[in-house]
Each structure stands twice: as C-alpha cells, then as structure tokens.
Amino acid sequence: MRTEMPLPLWRSALKGYAMVKVSIIVPVHNSENYLHKCVESLLAQTLEDIEIILVDDCSADASRDMIRRYEKLVPGKIVGIYLDENIRQGGARNRGMEIARGEYIGFVDSDDFVEPDMCRALYEAAQGADLCGADYYMDFDGELKDVNTDYGAGWRMSPRRRERFISRCGYFWSRIYRRDFLVKHDLRFPENTFYEDAYFNFLTAMHAESLVKAEGRFYHYYQSENSTMRRRNDPKQYERLAIPRLIMGECKARGLYDSHRELVLRKYMSMQMSNITYTCLDQFDAPDREKLGQIKEAIKADCPKYRQYRAYKTESLRLRIYLRLTMLSPRLTVLVHKADGLVELMEVLAKKLKRRKKR
C-alpha cells in the first residue's frame, strides 16, 4: 500500500518545526457525542510535550466545529486537519502522520479515551524502541474488562518473539511507534476501507526490530452495541475480505514474503479461514455464497498448494474443514453451516479416522 505522499517529502515535511515527544492522531467522523471526552483525556496527559492531531474525515455533524473550538482554545497543542472527502480512519490517520512532529506517534479513536499517564508511561518505557505498548481496557458502556497483552521479554525482536507477537497482539491502540521507524519503512494504513488495522499491525510487526511493554493499563477501547465489530448483517463486514490479499501483495512487494514466507502464509491463511467462518457465516443470517466464492478464488490464486503449508496444517480441524468445504463448493459450505452439529460430527469422524490410521 504505497503512500500518496512521496516518502522524501514525508521525511522533510517537518524541517524548521520543533519536535515534540509524542504526537497523538485522532481520526474523527461524526463523533460529536464522544469527542469531548476523548480530547479532554488527551489534554489531561501528564506528559506535557505532546501534540494532538484531530483529523475531521468529512463529518456531517458538529465534530468539525468542535475541533475548530479546541484549536482556538489550545493553540499549538491541538492541530486540526479538515478533509473534504471521506477516506475512512486509515486515510485520516495517514494525513495526520504526514504532519506529525512527534518523536513517537500514537493513535486514539474518537470514541475512546485514555488515562492521564498513558503518554508518559509509554514514552519513558520506549527508550528508542520501534514500538512500545501496554495493557488496556475493553469498555462496554462503562463495564470494564482487563485485557493483558503479551510482548515477550527483552528489547530486541527475535524470530520467535516476532511470531509470538504477531499471533497475540492484533491491535494498535495503547501503543506508540517511533516516527523514524514508520518513515523508514513507509508504514501507512490502507484507505477507504474498514479493518485497516490488521494490515498496519502486521506490517509494523514484520519490520520492527525492537519493542517494549510499559507497565500499567491506560487505554479505554469503547465497544458500543452499534459498533461495526458487533453489528450483524452489516455489509461493511465484507470489507474484511480484501485485507488478506492486500497484506499478501504488499509483503511480496516489500520482499517480506521471500524472507518470512511461513509468517506471511500463516497470517494469510488465518485471515482467510476467519473470513469464511466468522465474516461470511457467523455474521450473517443469510450467508452470501458469492462472497465465499471470492475467498475460494483468492486462495486458488495466492496459495494453490495451501494444503502443503504448515500454516494450514497447524490450524484447528474445524477451520480446516470449513476451508476444504469452501474450496470444494461455497454452496455446500452454506448448507453444512446451516445444519446444526454437522461440522462437529465431521470433526469427530475425522479424528476417529486419524486414530485408526495410527494403529
């Protein structure tokens, strides 16, 4: 996913500007009911040397006016960007990154908020690492769930640690990224799509050579009943289907497929299996066979010998059954899914056959 702003320009965009320790970028779209709480939590940070970049992604409510008021109220601390075209959260974050002055860059969603010590704790723990993160809260309308993250021990990224980090840390909130690291590897978000986080998370994890974890829990990741992640029968869910191919294509373009083939294949196959079972089947009352057919054709094009890959063999039997069914017939996949208990029966039979072969 190549940046629209040429890399040399991004490198030189801040010449003559004083750097700050941390830039926090907030994409904003029709967020008038949440934005105040979010911004106030950022203004309350105990680390003073920060900037807050609010990117209005063509809002139709009062969000843009709220940002302008904050710019006047706290000039220099808050910077507003006003887009005339909606380019989704990924595009809004990219525009913020283009002007960010921070040694480190972090991202906060406009309906989330953070604890006062977040920036200080992350910045002091980072100590020059490519990225630094922390545990966080899942906030279900005030009901908090503690989420612990596994960054592994140490500072340097080893092959085993990278694999573990990729499999267990699929988010980017409650993290900061060293700006020079993002610039060096031209790390950006895909634009005009949802689920852009999976792409960014994977590429940053593949390029990072150092990471650390700060002690504490600072980020409140808000989950309402109306969030895209929790809505059934929402066509936006299908935007997930494009992400595995975006990742595969970008990894090949960057040479990461050649240098980390097994990791890339594992991520690709895991996402495609999730797209079959979760996105296409579980999230819709009437699963779309054409969408399953798109996944089938993508796998045939990208991984025609998928059954030979360790990335396939190490997945659960249930996921492998659904994948094999989809590759055989998307229509059959839907019929089997609707027949309660049929996949579970197939799992039992497959395990029994496997045990007999070992005798």
What are these regions (language model features)?
Residues 20-23, 51, 199:
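Cell-envelope/extracellular polymer assembly enzymes that use nucleotide-activated donors
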Residues 30-44:
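Short, well-formed alpha-helical segments that are part of the catalytic scaffolds
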Residues 34-36, 61-70, 113, 117:
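Acidic helix N-cap motif at the loop->helix transition within catalytic regions
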Residues 41, 48, 56-66, 85, ...:
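A conserved acidic beta->alpha catalytic loop
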Residues 83-100, 107:
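Glycine-rich, basic loop-to-helix element that forms the pyrophosphate-binding segment
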Residues 89-92, 110-214, 222-235:
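Donor-binding/catalytic cores of nucleotide-activated saccharide
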Residues 217-224, 231-258, 274-306:
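Catalytic core of nucleotide-sugar-dependent glycosyltransferases
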Residues 282-359:
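Membrane-interface aromatic/basic loop that binds lipid-linked glycans or pyrophosphate carriers
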